[in-house]
């Protein structure tokens, strides 16, 4: 199922909040406020996947600065996270273009990209591994994240070792996280 991937606009906030509320059970109004705030946060970038005019998925890329005082802190860098796809459309090719787009944006700024996952999220791990992410450690701390079952995995991808199609797309993302 082909999806159009584009940056999030203010017009997408309600659709994203509804999608996330359906997944997490959180209050849609609070989610709307948080997502709207993310649009003006220079450390975050958000994208949506659109099929037939409807937002069917979204994802974010976040700049994380490690707290050096925290033992086992995840390293500073650009982290792929927050992928949500309509449950009826999962495993139909929507998550991969969202992930490729975020990798291109990350690689336009840095030589590596990071990703964290619950050890039980086999579908996500398989997709990210196919795109060049490799496990770094299972012993790390990331602010505000607790993993179901208690086990998370920190992954890293480098420009040199990631999928060959990515470098050709990097030009469009130059400056995405520049001051």
For the regions a language model picked out, list residue spans one by one.
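A short beta-loop-alpha structural element at the N-terminal edge
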Residues: 2-16
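Active-site rim helix/loop that mediates acceptor-substrate recognition in acyltransferases
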Residues: 23-51, 58-60, 66
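Conserved acyl-donor/pantetheine-binding loop and adjacent beta-alpha core of acyl/acetyltransferases
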Residues: 50, 54, 58-82, 142-150
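A short, internal acetyl-CoA/4′-phosphopantetheine-binding micro-motif in the GNAT/acyltransferase core
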Residues: 80-90, 117-118
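Conserved acetyl-CoA-binding loop-helix of GNAT-fold acetyltransferases
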Residues: 85, 91-104, 126, 130
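Conserved GNAT acetyl-CoA-binding A-motif
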Residues: 106-118
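Conserved catalytic-core motifs of GNAT/GCN5-like acyltransferases
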Residues: 116-117, 129-151
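C-terminal "cap" of GNAT-fold acetyltransferases
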Residues: 141-179
């Amino acid at each position: 199922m082909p999806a159009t991937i584009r940056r999030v606009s203010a017009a997408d906030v309600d659709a994203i909040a509804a999608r996330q509320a359906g997944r997490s059970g959180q209050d849609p109004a609070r989610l709307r406020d948080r997502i709207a705030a993310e649009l003006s946060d220079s450390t975050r970038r958000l994208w949506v996947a659109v099929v037939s005019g409807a937002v069917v998925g979204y994802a974010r890329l976040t700049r994380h600065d490690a707290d050096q005082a925290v033992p086992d802190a995840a390293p500073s860098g650009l982290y792929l996270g927050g992928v949500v796809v309509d449950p009826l459309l999962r495993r139909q090719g929507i998550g991969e273009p969202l992930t490729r787009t975020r990798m291109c944006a990350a690689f336009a700024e840095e030589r590596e990209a990071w990703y964290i996952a619950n050890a039980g999220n086999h579908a996500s791990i398989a997709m990210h591994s196919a795109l060049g992410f490799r496990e770094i450690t299972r012993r790390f701390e990331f602010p505000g994240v607790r993993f179901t079952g208690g086990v998370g995995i920190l992954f890293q991808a480098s420009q040199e070792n990631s999928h060959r199609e990515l470098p050709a797309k990097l030009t469009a993302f130059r400056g995405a996280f520049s001051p």
